[in-house]
Amino acid sequence: MTTPGPGPRSGEPARAKHVELSFLTPDGRRNRTWARFGPDSGPLSRGPVRTRNTLLNNTVKCVQVRAAGTDAPGGAQAAFASCAAIDAETAVALRLHRALGAPGASGPFPVLIGYELDAAEPFALYRPPRGRTVERMHGLPGAQLRVIEQELVDALAVLAELGLVHHGIAPETVRWDGRRIQLWGLDAVTHTGRPRTPRGAAPYAPPEVREGAGRSDPRDGLWSAAQVMYSLVTGRPGAPDRPPPDLADHRSLAHTMGSSFAPRAADRPTPAALLALLAPDRAPAADRLPADGLAAHRAGYDRALASKRPAGAVAPGEAVGEAVGHPAGAPTGEVLCPYCLEPIRYDPTALHTPDAVQELRPYNPHAQPNPRLLADELRGAFQLCPGNGTVREHHIPVPYLTNGRPLTVAMIGQSNTGKSHLLTQMVAEIADDRLKPYGISWQSVNPRQHAGFLNSRVVPLRDGRVLAHTAGLGQDETARFVESLLITDASGRTRPLAFFDLAGEDLLRTDALLRFLLGIDALIFVVDPTIAMPLAQLDEVRTTLDQHVNRDGDPAFATVLDRVPRTGPYLTVPSAVVVAKADLLRSEPPVDRWLGEPGHTALSRRRLHEESRDVYALLDRDAGKAWLRPFDTALHCTLHVASATGGRQEDSRYPRGVRAQRVLEPLLSLFAMHGIVELPEGRPVDEVDR
């Protein structure tokens, strides 16, 4: 974040005026200092970012790589892409910093000194580039060429061990100072196994990357490294999609990098194997990197999942069958009233419709002879439910009673955890037909109520406004769903989907208000990382919101888990745990892997398993066992990361706009457990393109 400073001193050009620059250091500490910026210069990669020299406190030279603003060509859409590139680049730089330590001037990668991802133009700060780009370095001595070759492959081997792939290696991103290389273009680094997106130009970008075919492979970068070496040896670019025709004339290059010119990644060696050939005395990258800090916690997930299997637990993404109740469309025609939990069936003699002032008046469907008009009127009609001794009479939308067994979902978490924002974006994504790839179509249960939800929640949030806190209910009020939809699956079965979203303080009550939980079909437990995780980079957010870390877990979780009935050692209601506000952790592994995925990435059972394993490990390490109680209690439970907004709020607005990330994955997991969608098995990351 920047604040205008006192302005330039006498004789300084206007562009060099001082501003106060605020950023986080790689260890999560807030730093504020005066800065002067030079003009935008040539990019250090081919990505959608801007670069300029920067002077901090009149002494520290650095380079600022920043996102383009909304005034850049392409407008808001290009700005979002640019912000996403900075997010991804910073996550990579932080991962390298933590894996390699704070490298000195001889390190193979750019040295990160700070970053700010929630500024209007998010940025990262690096030490100045070392050496010169190799674009015009034809004629280097053979000894130097061998060092460049070894260091390029070594850098790719390090990235591969970290689960990363560099898609931006080209002469302008490789620098050489006579002794060591420095590899820039971190915005072009992606995760192994992620779908390739078209990027780069021939001959340096591999054919599969230029075409956006298949999935990212650590061997992608070897093609680019080989092309860079060919240009250094010959002074000209190589062939775009095959080995250079004169490769045999350059015997040393053909011996070391010949196999790296294979057009398909699957036909190239791995970086580790090639490094062993080029530098047999150098320790493998795996031996030089610190142990994975989450490995032991992932193993804990495996043990916890295995302990549930004797009780009937299924793998993530599989249907759990009768454990979740009767199938949709039970032949009795009865459904459970979501409010009083009494059986109810459609009764044409108990219908009401709203008048001009929204007062419910008796409605006789037999008075409407036109079948089309009757169907439309019934969509807006309500049926009186007499209630019981605890819950007074109330009204249920007619389509809720006439479309099979409803699926009711409750959002669980204390106040300010982001439940309402997450639910709002779930509904918005459904309304945008984001479930269509899974064969699911939708329609509102009650058009007027749905329009009210869109106007009161979706429109303000997508306009960048922070939603008001959910109001608490009075002692005599009944919990009601806030939105309901009709969903039709790929087989043509339709059923209502209804969401409950209560205030956090109401979820702590032990009176009749929470009786709706006795008939609930699915639970979404929302974890707020600012309350759950004592990470340094979250301290500033906690201070702003006057929040504190609670190592004892969310009290709303405990109340709900105690209230929902169970018939054995485990709760059988399908559940999902969601680390919400995950944008606050978007540069943290493993959150960066999942949150940075393209929105079109298909879900599979294997991916659900991998994400659940990662999120369990994250919570186990950084939050503690109390925050994993929903997973330990529920027989069928997956874990997820999601962000409803994509960034932090400021003065009741989201200054960068709003971008939903992974908000539907928890719901899709619940759909899979209920047999509404059938997810493919998928394949492991280490099998990509084999």
Explain the meaning of each model-derived region.
Residues 111-120:
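Short beta-strand micro-motifs within the conserved protein kinase catalytic domain, predominantly
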Residues 119-132:
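Conserved short submotifs of the Hanks-type protein kinase catalytic core
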Residues 148-149:
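Activation segment signature within eukaryotic-like protein kinase domains
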Residues 262-273:
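A conserved short helix/loop substructure at the end of the activation segment
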